[in-house]
């Protein structure tokens, strides 16, 4: 889908670039596949802010998307492509031969009327899903599982994809968009193709209100706060903060490594940070 560039008919329109969604379905989602969604406003069960700068935004209903794709060897026809406010990618409504409906992540080049299928050995075409063990090496995939049966976790955002670069001793070697190379069990499912809406990265928000519609509140820098509010706060006139960047609670940020899961380090063949060292 193309980008829409708006003429500066008002200050808010100036610079506005959005994705053209005219080809998507304009009605409401399937009621049986939707759930209510309560806003948290960044608060936890105690009512305390655990994620700052969130709140407000347009009301949403949650679309139940099938990330597992475990209905083997049952063809499904793509009824329509839909917008989903809960993710950057588009979703596709598919209808199985027995009449059951489901939402799946829409890959690029998937059109209404196409037939998708998941199974142990199926055609390598966008929207089909099968275990990594049977996908040809070099194939572009998305919605990749990390544990068999858990459902896809890798490459689900708009325009993302993973390349299968090899297989070894029951594991598949994947190259992620970040540059990381990692192993996952070859019995994990993956869907063929790259995720839809690749132009999402080219959107220009153009006004503060549009971010508020998305539930994002203003992100205040620590350096403009008072000393009581942030370690970078205070000072006469504009200051640089005077120390290495820290969070409001004094922990190093901007480049500080936060990965703590040592148990899965052995599956990471190449770190995403290696490319930066050059």
Swiss-Prot record:
GO biological process: cytoplasmic translation
SUPFAM superfamilies (UniProt xref): Nucleic acid-binding proteins, Translation proteins SH3-like domain
Pfam family of the protein (one): Ribosomal_L2_C
Regions of compositional bias (Basic residues) in chain numbering: 269-278
Cysteines engaged in disulfide bonds, as pairs: none
Keywords: Ribonucleoprotein, Ribosomal protein, RNA-binding, rRNA-binding
SMART domains in the record: Ribosomal_L2, Ribosomal_L2_C
InterPro entries in the cross-refs: NA-bd_OB-fold (IPR012340), Rib_uL2_dom2 (IPR014722), Ribosomal_uL2 (IPR002171), Ribosomal_uL2_bac/org-type (IPR005880), Ribosomal_uL2_C (IPR022669), Ribosomal_uL2_CS (IPR022671), Ribosomal_uL2_dom3 (IPR014726), Ribosomal_uL2_RNA-bd_dom (IPR022666)
Region (Disordered): 225-278
Gene3D superfamilies: 2.30.30.30, Nucleic acid-binding proteins, Ribosomal protein L2, domain 3
Coiled-coil intervals, chain numbering: none
Domain of life: Bacteria
GO terms under cellular component: large ribosomal subunit
Molecular functions per Gene Ontology: rRNA binding; structural constituent of ribosome; transferase activity
UniProt cross-references to HAMAP family, sorted A to Z: Ribosomal_uL2_B
Function: One of the primary rRNA binding proteins. Required for association of the 30S and 50S subunits to form the 70S ribosome, for tRNA binding and peptide bond formation. It has been suggested to have peptidyltransferase activity; this is somewhat controversial. Makes several contacts with the 16S rRNA in the 70S ribosome.
Similarity-based family: Belongs to the universal ribosomal protein uL2 family.
PANTHER family given in the database record: LARGE RIBOSOMAL SUBUNIT PROTEIN UL2M, RIBOSOMAL PROTEIN L2
Subunit structure: Part of the 50S ribosomal subunit. Forms a bridge to the 30S subunit in the 70S ribosome.
Protein name, entry field: Large ribosomal subunit protein uL2
Organism the protein comes from: Parvibaculum lavamentivorans (strain DS-1 / DSM 13023 / NCIMB 13966)
Record lineage: Bacteria, Pseudomonadati, Pseudomonadota, Alphaproteobacteria, Hyphomicrobiales
């Amino acid at each position: 889908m193309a980008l829409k560039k708006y003429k500066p008919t008002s200050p808010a329109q100036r610079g506005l670039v959005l994705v053209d969604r005219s080809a998507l379905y304009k009605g409401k989602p399937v009621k049986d596949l939707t759930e209510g969604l309560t806003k948290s406003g960044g608060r936890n069960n105690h009512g305390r802010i655990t994620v700052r700068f969130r709140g407000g935004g347009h009301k949403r209903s949650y679309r139940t998307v099938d990330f597992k794709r475990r209905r083997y060897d049952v063809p499904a026809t793509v009824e329509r492509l839909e917008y989903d406010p809960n993710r950057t990618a588009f979703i596709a409504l598919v209808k199985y031969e027995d009449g059951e409906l489901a939402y799946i992540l829409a890959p690029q080049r998937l059109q209404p009327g196409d037939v998708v299928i998941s199974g142990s050995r199926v055609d390598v075409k966008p929207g089909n899903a099968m275990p990594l063990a049977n996908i040809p090496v070099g194939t572009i995939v998305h919605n990749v599982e990390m544990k068999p049966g858990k459902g896809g976790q890798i490459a689900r955002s708009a325009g993302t994809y993973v390349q299968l670069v090899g297989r070894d001793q029951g594991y598949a070697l994947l190259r992620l968009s970040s540059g990381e190379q990692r192993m996952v069990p070859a019995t994990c499912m993956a869907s063929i193709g790259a995720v839809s809406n690749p132009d999402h990265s080219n959107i220009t928000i153009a006004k503060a209100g549009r971010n508020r519609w998305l539930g994002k509140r203003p992100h205040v820098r620590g350096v403009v706060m008072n000393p009581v509010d942030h370690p970078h706060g205070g000072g006469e006139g504009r200051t640089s903060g005077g120390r290495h960047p820290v969070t409001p609670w004094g922990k190093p940020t901007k480049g500080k490594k936060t990965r703590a899961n040592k148990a899965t380090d052995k599956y990471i063949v190449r770190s995403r940070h290696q490319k930066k060292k050059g």
